[in-house]
Curated annotation (Swiss-Prot):
It comes from Mus musculus (Mouse). Residues 156-178 are annotated as: Interaction with BCL9. This is Catenin beta-1. The modification Phosphoserine is found at residues 23, 29, 33, 37, 45, 191, 246, 552, 675. Keywords: Acetylation, Activator, Cell adhesion, Cell junction, Cell membrane, Cell projection, Cytoplasm, Cytoskeleton, Glycoprotein, Membrane, Neurogenesis, Nucleus, Phosphoprotein, Repeat, S-nitrosylation, Synapse, Transcription, Transcription regulation, Ubl conjugation, Wnt signaling pathway.
Length: 781
């Protein structure tokens, strides 16, 4: 059959008028039917359109060749001869396309292929038959491989057990080659004797090549569940663990990847690896430098440590925390960083590993990756930092981490914001440097904005409020922070959090924050205008009722509601009202809510810190003559006189101040006796001071801050939210109080609460006592 070039040569030889007609047609934009040019009137074999073997040829290529012309011409007889050759070899072309192996060697067959990049129709039609042929061949070869392996396995098993190490080496090489083919690989794994021989040879050989081949064979088998089971049953795990001590990198790679496959897919493999000492060997391998090898090793450690405390302790004893932190600090390979962060996350919930990771610089190392493009890496680092952060409150060099965390508060990812808020809450607890740093990088504004955005998502609002509570207390920037919350429109949302649907942990944190905000006089009026005082009183009454009810039923232990003791709420609300009462207008509101009888009752509390805040708020209220008279009318003189002998200096001082203010309109003789009593009580441990002071001579009204909380007061501790840090320089103490000591607890009245007027009508809005606990828990997940 003629080629396309031949056909064009023939057309050139046609009569001039026809050639001119065709050229004229090519230069026109209309479509030619062929009537005038004769373009479609030639025989099918000459037109190039009737042959099913030929492809449609690109017109541009034809035109280009046409314009170039041809150097060779063909006669009509030559064309007929060429056409005959193509017709005679059609069967051979089909056979060559479908069954090329049937052709005689050296046979030349004319090709109809014009463009080598485009197969002819026959070639394309032959593809399925070729695929079928290859499938049949593969099936035959597979069967041959399986039969060969089945026949060879018994003999190879004997050779692997031979005493001659040269023979063993040759057998190991042959078995390794067989394991690379699927059919023979299945035959090997179905022979327990062969697998046992491979394991035994690998474990006992001193030859590097033999160890490499046997380990490679087990690696190939481990890609199948049947192979994993065969390795496990043959005692392969102890042998593979032993191979982790090999100095040969290829053996190490085969061993760790095989163990990795076993840990992932074979039941019982984890315990077997632990019993074989695999954890210690794997930790020792963390000093290698191949990042892909390290990624597999760290993933093995994560699988072994997850949910297993003993494994975590073994990793700790083997120096794992330091090695893992070094990896996080050194490498940039994302998969390695991700697998390593997963191990650290698992270890970070272990109370023993946690300080070790922190001491190794884990906080700073993890902080390096918080801006990584990999979201899975960032999330793992944040989870780990969150778990570690309560043990890192004394760490230095956290400036970079704190700045990044403040930036992450603006993230659109809820998980990122939740973790960042929790970490900031813990890191700002009891660490004045961290507090100042967060304030200086805009932390107050970011946290207020976070609370505003969070709405009723307490997993975000609780840590954010706790962080604000820490930042508004006991450091050089505290007053600025107290003002900043107001300036960034935070007071309305803070007071709103005292109301439903807030649960007790969040309410407790919010009460502490309000207490700190009240330390700034500029916040007194805004807090009052937002309705903070009535709500604090409502919460106080509700919590006190709870403790009263339990006491009347004979209960001795403090009850937790959603992880919060009601005694903590009593102390927190009373402490906040104490600071708010420094403002004369606030005192009027507090007194108007008929709270004095309740404060007097709290003087009988068996908890020393509740006694202190109750005496403190009475001290502020007693500045007003009307309130002082009401306090005395409620019978406060007896408990206050008793509290003069308290071992807590703050309690005794406040009690003395209240008694002194109550005596201002009493006769001079009464004042004299009271002064002597107060002096003897307050200076009972300082005889020289007693001798030097015949009279108190205290101007209670001018004392001001002297009656506030003192930094050197040993009983001064924190009001903190469970799990979000405990700022000992923040709110009044609310945990682990001394239940004993000298106090009038036996006389504590339990016969109901005083009427609080309109405040009582809103009590139904308080959170229920049996809501699910929202405290923070560390988990492996």
């Amino acid at each position: 059959m003629a080629t396309q070039a031949d056909l064009m040569e023939l057309d050139m030889a046609m009569e001039p008028d026809r050639k001119a007609a065709v050229s004229h047609w090519q230069q026109q934009s209309y479509l030619d039917s062929g009537i005038h040019s004769g373009a479609t009137t030639t025989a099918p074999s000459l037109s190039g359109k009737g042959n099913p073997e030929e492809e449609d040829v690109d017109t541009s290529q034809v035109l280009y060749e046409w314009e170039q012309g041809f150097s060779q011409s063909f006669t009509q007889e030559q064309v007929a001869d060429i056409d005959g050759q193509y017709a005679m070899t059609r069967a051979q072309r089909v056979r060559a396309a479908m069954f090329p192996e049937t052709l005689d060697e050296g046979m030349q067959i004319p090709s109809t292929q014009f463009d080598a990049a485009h197969p002819t129709n026959v070639q394309r039609l032959a593809e399925p038959s070729q695929m079928l042929k290859h499938a049949v061949v593969n099936l035959i070869n597979y069967q041959d491989d399986a039969e060969l392996a089945t026949r060879a396995i018994p003999e190879l098993t004997k050779l692997l057990n031979d005493e001659d190490q040269v023979v063993v080496n040759k057998a190991a090489v042959m078995v390794h080659q067989l394991s690379k083919k699927e059919a023979s690989r299945h035959a090997i794994m179905r022979s327990p004797q062969m697998v046992s021989a491979i394991v035994r040879t690998m474990q006992n050989t001193n030859d590097v090549e033999t160890a490499r081949c046997t380990a490679g064979t087990l690696h190939n088998l481990s890609h199948h569940r049947e192979g994993l089971l065969a390795i496990f049953k043959s005692g392969g795990i102890p042998a593979l663990v032993k191979m982790l001590g090999s100095p040969v990198d290829s053996v190490l790679f085969y061993a760790i990847t095989t163990l990795h496959n076993l840990l992932l897919h074979q039941e019982g493999a984890k315990m077997a690896v632990r019993l074989a000492g695999g954890l210690q060997k794997m930790v020792a391998l963390l000093n290698k430098t191949n990042v892909k090898f390290l990624a597999i090793t760290t993933d093995c450690l994560q699988i072994l440590a997850y949910g297993n405390q003993e494994s975590k302790l073994i990793i700790l004893a083997s120096g794992g925390p330091q090695a893992l932190v070094n990896i996080m600090r050194t490498y940039t390979y994302e998969k390695l960083l991700w697998t390593t962060s997963r191990v650290l996350k698992v270890l970070s919930v272990c109370s023993s590993n946690k300080p070790a990771i922190v001491e190794a610089g884990g906080m700073q190392a993890l902080g390096l990756h918080l801006t990584d493009p990999s979201q899975r890496l960032v999330q793992n680092c944040l989870w780990t930092l969150r778990n570690l952060s309560d043990a890192a409150t004394k760490q230095e060099g956290m400036e970079g981490l704190l700045g990044t965390l403040v930036q992450l508060l603006g993230s659109d990812d809820i998980n990122v914001v939740t973790c960042a808020a929790g970490i900031l809450s813990n890191l700002t607890c009891n660490n004045y440097k961290n507090k100042m740093m967060v304030c200086q990088v805009g932390g107050i504004e970011a946290l207020v904005r976070t609370v505003l955005r969070a709405g009723d998502r307490e997993d975000i609002t609780e840590p954010a409020i706790c962080a604000l509570r820490h930042l508004t207390s006991r450091h050089q920037e505290a007053e600025m922070a107290q003002n900043a919350v107001r300036l960034h429109y935070g007071l309305p949302v803070v007071v709103k959090l005292l109301h439903p649907p807030s649960h007790w942990p969040l309410i407790k944190a919010t009460v502490g924050l309000i207490r700190n905000l009240a330390l700034c006089p500029a916040n007194h009026a805004p807090l009052r205008e937002q309705g903070a005082i009535p709500r604090l009183v409502q919460l106080l009454v509700r919590a006190h009722q709870d403790t009263q009810r339990r006491t009347s039923m004979g209960g001795t232990q403090q009850q937790f509601v959603e992880g919060v003791r009601m005694e903590e709420i009593v102390e927190g609300c009373t402490g906040a009202l104490h600071i708010l009462a420094r403002d004369v207008h606030n005192r009027i509101v507090i007194r108007g809510l008929n709270t004095i009888p309740l404060f007097v009752q709290l003087l009988y509390s068996p908890i020393e810190n509740i006694q202190r805040v109750a005496a403190g708020v009475l001290c502020e209220l007693a500045q007003d003559k009307e309130a002082a008279e009401a306090i005395e009318a409620e019978g406060a003189t007896a408990p206050l006189t008793e509290l003069l002998h308290s071992r807590n200096e703050g309690v005794a001082t406040y009690a003395a101040a209240v008694l002194f203010r109550m005596s201002e309109d009493k006769p001079q003789d009464y004042k004299k006796r009271l002064s002597v009593e107060l002096t003897s009580s307050l200076f009972r441990t300082e005889p020289m001071a007693w001798n030097e002071t015949a009279d108190l001579g205290l101007d209670i009204g001018a004392q001001g801050e002297a009656l506030g909380y003192r930094q050197d007061d040993p009983s001064y501790r924190s009001f903190h939210s469970g799990g979000y840090g405990q700022d000992a320089l923040g709110m009044d103490p609310m945990m682990e109080h001394e239940m004993g000591g000298h106090h009038p607890g036996a006389d504590y009245p339990v016969d109901g609460l005083p009427d609080l007027g309109h405040a009582q009508d809103l009590m139904d809005g308080l959170p229920p006592g049996d809501s699910n606990q929202l405290a923070w828990f560390d988990t492996d997940l």
